[in-house]
Design a protein with these regions (language model features):
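Active-site-adjacent betaalpha module
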Residues: 2-6, 13, 26-42, 51-53, ...
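Acidic/histidine-rich helix-loop elements
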Residues: 15-23
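Active-site loop/turn elements of alpha/beta-hydrolase fold enzymes
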Residues: 48
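Glycine-rich loop at the start of a catalytic domain that most often binds anionic cofactors/ligands
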Residues: 57-61
Length: 185
């Protein structure tokens, strides 16, 4: 496989819902438009799929508002992006995380990762939020020895902060970063 694309948590609650990331709708629309040009051989989409009483939720002593409850509207993939994914001809895999009631999970790749990534020459990484789940996914993929293959799509990875935390991890892990516009230049 030449190119894999990982899209982290492009869900309604992180865009227009209970835990919105500034610039997320524009970033996910930009990504949806760029998907055909990205020409990925396989796409992996991670998704928060929390139980109703998840430990990360404020009413249960956590730090986050209730978000991405499995099967809720807020857990759905951003519609323009979902439509663009459906139009692709490559395989698409959805990876749920945060499913355990008493365990928060900021990365879908803590313990394992899709073995298809080993054969990828390039792994593009983007999604929401840049300073939380994209950052932790990057750290875990790098820990699994995949850093040399990773390129972070910075304009498709908006953060709850000003982007500083993600940029710091990009530097630490020595992965590449690029905007969608400059991807194949």
């Amino acid at each position: 496989m030449k190119r894999a694309l990982i899209i982290v948590d492009p869900q309604l609650d992180f865009i227009t819902g209970t835990l919105p990331v500034g610039g997320a709708s524009e970033a996910m629309d930009r990504l949806a438009t760029a998907l055909p040009k990205i020409a990925a051989d396989q796409v992996f989409v991670t998704m928060d799929a929390h139980p109703i009483k998840h430990c990360s939720f404020e009413p249960n002593g956590g730090i986050w508002p209730t978000h991405c409850v499995k099967y809720s509207t807020g857990a759905a993939i951003w519609e323009p992006l979902m439509e663009a994914l459906i139009a692709l001809s490559c395989p698409i895999s959805f990876i749920e995380k945060g499913c355990d009631l008493d365990r928060d999970q900021y990365s879908a790749f803590e313990d394992r990762y899709p073995k298809e990534l080993e054969s990828a020459e390039e792994i593009l990484l983007c999604g929401l939020a840049g300073n939380v789940c994209v950052l932790n996914s990057l750290k875990d993929l790098a820990r699994h020895g995949l850093a040399s293959k990773i390129t972070v799509l910075t304009d498709a990875s908006p953060s709850l902060d000003d982007g500083t935390a993600l940029n710091e991890i990009i530097r630490e892990t020595k992965v590449k970063s690029v905007t969608l516009e400059n991807l194949d230049k």
